[in-house]
Amino acid sequence: MARVKRGVQARRRHKKILTLAKGYYNARRKVFRVAKQAVIKAQQYAYIGRKQKKRNFRSLWITRINAAARINGLSYSRFMNGLLKAGITLDRKVLADIAVHDAAGFAALAEKAKGALAA
């Protein structure tokens, strides 16, 4: 059986990790063993961050909707309940965008929500 030398594969594997570690400081960029740990940790943080991003944006949208709703005399929960009763199905992302960029449009939505709550 022929002897298998793995120099090419090892170099390729090392190069892949060291390429991912570009921009890191000191040994985290230069030493394979340290760079591998740094890259694994960075990928873990990136994975967690992608999940947290969804939570953070949802809470930001809710905060913006709440602020705009209170300007129009409603709490967030009553505003959302009013929209539900009025049959208006806009998601929080769109509502937050309307609240920031179109105050008059949001005021009209708030009036519809108030009307649906009163009825």
UniProtKB/Swiss-Prot annotation:
HAMAP family for this protein: Ribosomal_bL20
Signal sequence interval, chain numbering: none
Top-rank taxon, per record: Bacteria
Protein name (Swiss-Prot/TrEMBL): Large ribosomal subunit protein bL20
Keyword annotations: Ribonucleoprotein, Ribosomal protein, RNA-binding, rRNA-binding
Annotated GO CC locations: ribonucleoprotein complex; ribosome
Classification via PANTHER family: 39S RIBOSOMAL PROTEIN L20
Disulfide bonds: none
Similarity field: Belongs to the bacterial ribosomal protein bL20 family.
PROSITE patterns the record matches: RIBOSOMAL_L20
UniProt cross-references to Pfam families, sorted A to Z: Ribosomal_L20
Record-level Gene Ontology MF annotations: rRNA binding; structural constituent of ribosome
Cited function: Binds directly to 23S ribosomal RNA and is necessary for the in vitro assembly process of the 50S ribosomal subunit. It is not involved in the protein synthesizing functions of that subunit.
Gene transcribed to yield this protein: rplT
Lipid metabolism as UniProt keyword: no
Any Gene Ontology biological process: ribosomal large subunit assembly
